[in-house]
From Swiss-Prot:
HAMAP family: UxaC. This is Uronate isomerase. Coiled coil: none annotated. SUPFAM superfamilies: Metallo-dependent hydrolases (SSF51556). It catalyses: D-glucuronate = D-fructuronate; aldehydo-D-galacturonate = keto-D-tagaturonate. Pathway: Carbohydrate metabolism; pentose and glucuronate interconversion. It comes from Staphylococcus haemolyticus (strain JCSC1435). GO terms for biological process: D-galacturonate catabolic process; D-glucuronate catabolic process. Pfam families: UxaC.
Amino acid sequence: MAFINEHFMLNNETGKHLYHDFAKDMPIYDYHCHLDPKQISDNVACDNITDLWLSGDHYKWRAMRAQGIEEQYITGDAAPLDKFKKWTETLENSVGNPLYHWSQLELKMYFDIEDLLTSDNAEAIYHRANDYLKQHHTTTQSLITDSNVNLICTTDNPTDDLNYHDAIKAKDGFNTTVLPAFRPDDVFKVGDPAFTDLLQKLENLTHPITTPSDFIEALYKRIQYFHDKGGRLADHGLEEMHFEAYTDQAIQDIFKKALNHADISTYERFQFQSYMLNELSKAYYERGWVMQIHFGAIRNNNTKMFEKVGKDAGFDSIRDQDNLAYHLNATLDMMEQEGHLPKTILYNLNPIYNDIVGSTIANFQTEPGIKSKVQHGAGWWFNDTKRGMLRQMSSLADQGLLMHFVGMLTDSRSFISYSRHDYFRRILSSFIGDLVEKGEIPNDDQLLKRMIENICYNNAYNYFKLI
C-alpha cells in the first residue's frame, strides 16, 4: 500500500468515516494566505516542481540548512534539478517532521506520484513531475481550481493599488473569489525607517501627515479603499501583545519624535501600538471587518544570514513574553469599553499560551447573534503540525466552543499548499473520531456531520460573509 493512501493519518474507524463522508470534499475557504495576486491574475504557467516547491518556502529552507546543504542550493542560483536533489536529500532525513507528510501529499495530489521520494529516484521524479505539469498545462489558476478553493484572501500592504484583484475579478473562467486583506504592520514600527517610509507613501496617496489625526485619517481612507475593493479582513503581525495606557498628548509627543527621527523608548512604542490597535479597530468595527492578530514571532535572529539573504528566509522563531494574560485582556477590554471590538481572531505562535488565549476570548463573547465573535486562530507556523493542531483544538474545546471554530488556513506563499487543508481535515477527523470511540462524544451522525462540515468550511463562510 502506498504511504499516502486513502486512510493516511486516519487511525480509527470513526475518523475514516468522518473524513471520507463529510470532510474530504468540502470546498476550501482560505481566508489568510500570502499568495501573490499578480501571479494569480497573470495565470502563470507552472512547469517546474523546484519553483513550486522551493521558491520562497522558508520551512524547507530551514530543514535544508539543518541537513548541512550549502546556501547556493537553498536561496542561491543553483540549477533547478540540483536544488531538487538537495531538497530530496533533506526530505529523506525529515521523517517525523510535517514537511515529510506535506511533500508526499503534494506529490500525490498535484503530480499523481505515489512513490516515496528518495535520492535514488530524485531525478526520475523531477522529470515525471515536470512532464505532468506541462502535459496538464498547469497554471496558478488551475492549481487553485483543482484544489476546490472557493475563496482566497491575500495579504496586502495599506498602500497597494489592488489592481491585480480587479483584474482577477474581471476574468472569465476563473470562479474563485480573490479578495485583499489589509496588513498594516509598519504602522506599529514607530521610530523605524519602515514607519517613515509608510508615512511618505500614505502622503502620496492621501494628504499631508503632520499629526496623529492626519495619520489615522489617511489609514481610514486606505481602509475604505480596501473595503470598496471587497476587503473585509485586516491582519496585524506583532512581536508581542503589549498594552500600555496612553493620553492624546503622549501620542502627539511620540509622533512628533518619529517625524523628527528622535529616539523613542520601548514604553512609548508600546503606547503607540495600543493606540494604533484601538484606532484601527474602530474602522474595522464600523465596516463589519474581521481583525486578525498574529503575535509571538521573534524575527531575523541570525544577523549574518539576515545581511546575506534578507528577511523571511527561515531565521525566525517563537518568542515568549511576560504577563501576556493582562496585556491581551487589557487590549480587548479597551476596545470593548469603547464599543468597537470587531470580530477578532487571535493567533498565538507560542503554544504554551493556548489556554491563556482560550480563557481570554471567552471574556469577550458578548455580542448577541455572533457565534464565537472572538476566535482562537488555528495552529500557526511552527504549530502548523499534527501536535500543534491537536493542542490548539484541544484547548479551544476545553475553553470555548470547538463547534464554532473557523478552521484551517494556508498562511502560505505556495500554490500547492492546499494539501495542508487535507492534512488538517484528516487530523480533525481522527481527533473527533477518537473522542467518539472513547465515548466522550456521542456517536450521532447528524451531530458529527455538522461539526466536521462546520469546521472545514461552513463556520468560515458564515463568520466572514465574503461570498
